[in-house]
Amino acid sequence: MDRDLEQALDRTENITEIAQQRRPRRRYSPRAGKTLQEKLYDIYVEECGKEPEDPQELRSNVNLLEKLVRRESLPCLLVNLYPGNQGYSVMLQREDGSFAETIRLPYEERALLDYLDAEELPPALGDVLDKASVNIFHSGCVIVEVRDYRQSSNMQPPGYQSRHILLRPTMQTLAPEVKTMTRDGEKWSQEDKFPLESQLILATAEPLCLDPSVAVACTANRLLYNKQKMNTDPMEQCLQRYSWPSVKPQQEQSDCPPPPELRVSTSGQKEERKVGQPCELNITKAGSCVDTWKGRPCDLAVPSEVDVEKLAKGYQSVTAADPQLPVWPAQEVEDPFRHAWEAGCQAWDTKPNIMQSFNDPLLCGKIRPRKKARQKSQKSPWQPFPDDHSACLRPGSETDAGRAVSQAQESVQSKVKGPGKMSHSSSGPASVSQLSSWKTPEQPDPVWVQSSVSGKGEKHPPPRTQLPSSSGKISSGNSFPPQQAGSPLKRPFPAAAPAVAAAAPAPAPAPAAAPALAAAAVAAAAGGAAPSHSQKPSVPLIKASRRRPAAGRPTRFVKIAPAIQVRTGSTGLKATNVEGPVRGAQVLGCSFKPVQAPGSGAPAPAGISGSGLQSSGGPLPDARPGAVQASSPAPLQFFLNTPEGLRPLTLQVPQGWAVLTGPQQQSHQLVSLQQLQQPTAAHPPQPGPQGSTLGLSTQGQAFPAQQLLNVNLTGAGSGLQPQPQAAVLSLLGSAQVPQQGVQLPFVLGQQPQPLLLLQPQPQPQQIQLQTQPLRVLQQPVFLATGAVQIVQPHPGVQAGSQLVGQRKGGKPTPPAP
């Protein structure tokens, strides 16, 4: 296809060259008259046979229409193009040869001009041409003479440039011609009009070439291109820039006066006049300067030395003593360490302004209280005094900023009110060196207690401890080492040794050790008194260490591992090792005062083990009577006696029971443990988390003024060695709390859960609790390995399995049947 097209284009060029070189042949028409096309062809043949008169005139066969009009004086339509905004007009020729103006249009109306460029007869002029007195149609075509006055408007008289255009009819003009011809009195049917229209089309159409060749179409396109090469879109855009529709808006804008705000001021006009004046500068040569005043030549010599100090003017540099110093914006560093504890305290926001003096590297910081909690106070920028040079400060470096932040923290820590620091002390036969039996390759780091700061920091709600359920895993905090869960002990209850040393495993104790625990609890309740501030308390103070609080986690979890084992008969304070998670847990490290349990011949060491203990600063939650579902545990709150006052301790327990005695029942019945595991061969320690899960569900009873809660934690699992874990706490409170029981499930590894049930005689009654100091007592603990079945004792059980005590001391009394 492309090859055929290329051949057709080559043939077109050859035909054009041959037609221009050879002489055309003359044609003879059989008709008497000749058409307009035939007349033009005859002139073309005639011009091609002539020799050029002027050597520069290479072609004479052009402008055939002008030659035809001059030769035959044919009537034509006249179009005048006037200069400027006068527009253009259309004029018809009269019979006497004069022209009458018919239509005058502005240049903005380009419809008629577009038809002239396309060499087509405009349909709008059909009626005007039909009414003309002179017939200007020639074989259905109209000859238009265009007179352009725009190029020679300055001449007198104004001249013009003339050219002729042949307008050919179109289908839009032939249809009105058919109607015009059939207007006479005769009636023309539609069948008669069709032959008339066909004859008009054939008469006005140009000759057709029916040669089936692509070269014919290519030749026609090339001829049309040569005729319309100046009518392309880019050329029209360039010509329209200088046409009147485009120039007119520019002239109108230049003729209009500028707005008042854009007028040049008078001073500016004077400057323009000065600039416009010519300035004559006569630069003479050096040495030819003449002093016009004295009339003698002036020799200008360059001085060898110039006293600069006399001629120059110096400016003093800005120093630190200059009072006019720039005001530096105060740079604020927000202290991320915020302290808050109890409800009702005012929140403070520490924002030290880090500024450094010019004279010395002293730093100053500011601590401003906030107006509202959890909102930053707006501070006015620091302004130096003009007369006070010591107040001239500048922004410090990052090192100074860090130093200022540390100073601000120290100032806050020194001014806040919190518990004092007190280290754990130990006396008696117990020694801290005995912790070696509990050491593991990966010991958890001891966690210091973060003390509450009254009046500083953010306000947090009282945290509550949720102990994990019996799933064998601890939800938060570091798990105890495997060797703690199954530490090899020589025997569970040493009789005379001050501490338990690492040795081979021993058989489990007998069930008769349970009464020792009950009796020891009664004796501790009767004989133990609240410690005073002047004496060394049985509960040591918390060692406070301020740490950065965790964002968004007000609840902190703690684990307390038993560190040493002591005999019942020993005296003095005992130390405990406190272990907990990394994130600022609050741990209660207590030393216990041993009490000899009546009725038991063997002492029992004790320790504290918990996986979810936490001190809380909130009030005791109110509880309403009624059954509560086991899935929604209720909190159990204790109070710890410290030099600063009572500290709340909240225990959140999942599911279970622990029955506390009513107000009139003074004794607890401790269920004896049955089906104890027999001593087995020593096995290597099995890994497993060590801890306890406390649970509480309330059902309409209130705690008495003072009760004893004996917690006996037993481990389960084959091959696991017994460990002493017990805590005897004195329940204190100041609100009515329903009481039903506390279940203490304990899990070691993935073995079944042994449960210990403390059940009193059911005497429900509600009384008001009175706030009293907390006593933490160490009692003999019975530990057994293996599955434990919980059985409610019969009233006829031996008296050694019953726990009897009084709230305010006294001798133990047997429980009611």
Swiss-Prot record:
Residues 1-14 have a biased composition (Basic and acidic residues). Residues 469-479, 494-505, 513-531, 598-618 have a biased composition (Low complexity). It comes from the Eukaryota. This is Transcription factor SPT20 homolog-like 2. Residues 1-28, 249-275, 369-553, 598-630, 675-697 are annotated as: Disordered. Belongs to the SPT20 family. One of its GO terms (biological process) is regulation of transcription by RNA polymerase II. Residues 423-440 have a biased composition (Polar residues). The gene is SUPT20HL2. GO terms for cellular component: extracellular space; SAGA complex. It holds the Pfam family Spt20_SEP. GO terms for molecular function: transcription coregulator activity.
